[in-house]
């Protein structure tokens, strides 16, 4: 248990660096404020005794006025100290949450793609946004309150026992029942708050998944099924929220009851002691104030601990994310290639997304500089996986991949990525101008070069029909077809002008005219570059220098189109079946 606590503190430590002094000042301010709060009733006791004694003779109004003025000054100082500690705690927590978000953003870039294969986008998004926000809000609302209330509770106890131990004992004993009840409730609340965060992540993930595939859901008439599934997830979220909020809701009433019970008990015991002459009326009045002061921090601590447990549940999920295994640190690696030619060699490559299942078994192939290499095969053959390995999105299990004779294991991922221009089947455009999308993360791109690339893929004319041309902002008001989006991503890849090019089914979702336009542009612009093309439509890669035919993670045939057709093997069957299908469609 001790090691676990140390581990938690170790996780928090880097996010609190530089905040120790402000937090220490806030703690000192909270202690001073607590002392002022408990010191005030002693002066009220003096005023009460002056008044009660003066009823028999004459009230010393000057003394009463002097004490009252002192109390006003004292409480003003207390207000200032309370504001100071609240401001410091709030500011420090915002710095803490900002650092946490920064750490998460940096962590995402260091995670292997395998993490995102195992976790839904909704779950990851929930950890980055909801969990951090929940932790920040809960800490902001409760941390300062719990600390201040704790100091006040200690100060009140010391003062009460110093004034009269019998009344102090009556006050403390009357609250033990409340503490016992609250302890039982708090023991159960942590699980409910953690379930709330997990269920919220599940709902977010499902909603994101269903909205992204809304057309498919509708076309398969799966709306009712989707509603039922969402209703189940939503009910789970409702139940966990209800339980956690119910617990939060009964905390304050329970503590108010304890406070009122203590108040009545102190009045009864105090009256009995006063009748016997053991205490003055002023002490009873002071204790009546102390009972309220004593029950208030108890209520605040109970409610604050509930919020802290909610923050703890959220922080657990955040630290789980930050504790995920990262990609290999490559800061020690130096740049390996200067004048890249573009020769790529796969040497007995083996890979599996999980240790139990190997996808690529013994992949060997050579792509000479400037060649157009096509990778074909049925769905699940491992075509896209080969591209992922080539881009070093995943680390291979066995064998090697060499670019110009250099093993990619010796190269930084950023160097490998710089070597490639890439066009994926799933286009990605962000909200920004067309210009920003085309020259994404590149410098020194002139307007002339950008326009030339747009013309090369046949998208320039469309761009110029838009109100602001290349400065048109791509948002919900601008509707682009699948083909237009794909042309923009191809133009972006051409502008990168890398020696290696990857086209992952780049023309499989566009019309015939657009496909021909893209194909001509790509044939012209792939000259002198080593290109890897993955396409289900074999008619688009007939002019490839080398065609690698894959099945079940292995190369079963290789050669150019004419050679493979002459062999009459798997490729020929695949090509002829597609050719027949095209004729039927026509």
Predicted segments with their positions:
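Helix-loop-helix
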Residues: 53-55, 60, 159-173, 243, ...
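Alpha-helical transmembrane segments of multi-pass membrane proteins
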Residues: 35, 74-93, 140, 144-151, ...
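Membrane-integrated ABC transporters
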Residues: 1-37, 52-67, 85-89, 93, ...
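Transmembrane helix-loop-helix hairpins at lipid-water interfaces of multipass membrane proteins
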Residues: 23-81, 161-166, 277-281
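Juxtamembrane loop-to-helix connectors within ABC transporter transmembrane domains
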Residues: 89, 93, 109-153
């Amino acid at each position: 248990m001790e090691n676990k606590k140390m581990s938690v503190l170790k996780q928090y430590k880097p996010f609190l660096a530089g905040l120790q002094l402000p937090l220490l000042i806030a703690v000192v301010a909270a202690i001073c404020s607590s002392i002022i709060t408990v010191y005030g009733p002693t002066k009220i006791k003096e005023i009460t005794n002056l008044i009660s004694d003066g009823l028999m003779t004459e009230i010393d109004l000057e003394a009463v006025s002097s004490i009252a003025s002192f109390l006003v000054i004292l409480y003003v100082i207390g207000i200032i100290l309370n504001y100071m500690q609240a401001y410091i705690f709030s500011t420090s927590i915002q710095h803490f949450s900002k650092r946490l978000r920064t750490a998460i953003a940096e962590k995402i870039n260091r995670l292997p793609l395998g993490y995102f294969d195992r976790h839904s986008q909704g779950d990851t998004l929930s950890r980055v946004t909801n969990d951090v926000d929940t932790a920040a809000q809960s800490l902001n609302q409760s941390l300062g309150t719990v600390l201040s209330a704790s100091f006040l509770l200690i100060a009140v106890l010391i003062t009460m026992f110093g004034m009269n131990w019998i009344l102090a004992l009556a006050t403390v004993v009357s609250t033990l029942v409340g503490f016992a009840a609250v302890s039982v409730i708090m023991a159960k609340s942590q699980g409910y708050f953690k379930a709330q965060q997990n269920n919220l992540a599940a709902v977010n993930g499902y909603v994101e998944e269903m909205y992204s595939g809304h057309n498919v859901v509708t076309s398969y008439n799966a709306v009712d099924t989707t509603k039922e599934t969402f209703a189940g997830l939503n009910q789970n979220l409702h139940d966990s929220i209800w339980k956690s909020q119910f617990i939060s809701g009964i905390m304050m009433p329970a503590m108010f009851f304890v406070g009122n019970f203590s108040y009545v008990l102190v009045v009864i015991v105090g009256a009995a002691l006063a009748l016997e002459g053991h205490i003055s009326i002023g002490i009873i009045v002071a204790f009546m104030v102390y009972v309220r002061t004593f029950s208030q921090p108890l209520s605040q601590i109970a409610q604050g601990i509930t919020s802290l447990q909610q923050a703890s549940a959220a922080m657990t999920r955040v630290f789980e994310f930050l504790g995920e295994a990262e990609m290999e640190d490559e800061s020690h690696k130096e740049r390996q290639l200067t004048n890249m030619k573009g020769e790529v060699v796969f040497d007995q490559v083996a890979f599996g997304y999980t240790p139990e299942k190997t996808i690529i078994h013994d992949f060997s192939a050579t792509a000479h500089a400037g060649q157009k290499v096509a990778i074909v095969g049925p769905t699940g053959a491992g075509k896209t996986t080969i591209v992922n390995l080539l881009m070093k999105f995943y680390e291979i299990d066995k064998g090697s991949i060499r670019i110009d004779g250099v093993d990619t294991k010796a190269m930084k991922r950023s160097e490998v990525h710089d070597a490639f221009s890439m066009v994926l089947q799933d286009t990605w455009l962000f909200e920004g101008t067309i210009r920003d999308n085309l020259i994404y993360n590149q410098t020194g791109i002139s307007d002339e070069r950008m326009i030339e690339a747009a013309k090369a893929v046949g998208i320039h004319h469309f761009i110029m029909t838009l109100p602001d041309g290349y400065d048109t902002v791509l948002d919900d008001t601008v509707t682009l077809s699948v083909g237009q989006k794909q042309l923009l991503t191809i133009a972006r890849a051409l502008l990168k002008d890398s020696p290696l090019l990857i086209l992952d089914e780049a023309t499989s979702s566009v019309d015939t005219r657009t496909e021909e336009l893209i194909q001509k542009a790509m044939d012209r612009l792939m000259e002198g570059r080593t290109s890897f093309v993955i396409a289900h439509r074999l008619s688009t890669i007939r002019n490839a220098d080398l065609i690698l035919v894959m099945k079940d993670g292995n190369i079963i045939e290789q050669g150019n189109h004419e050679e493979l057709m002459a062999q009459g093997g798997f490729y020929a069957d695949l090509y002829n079946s597609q050719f027949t299908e095209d004729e039927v469609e026509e």
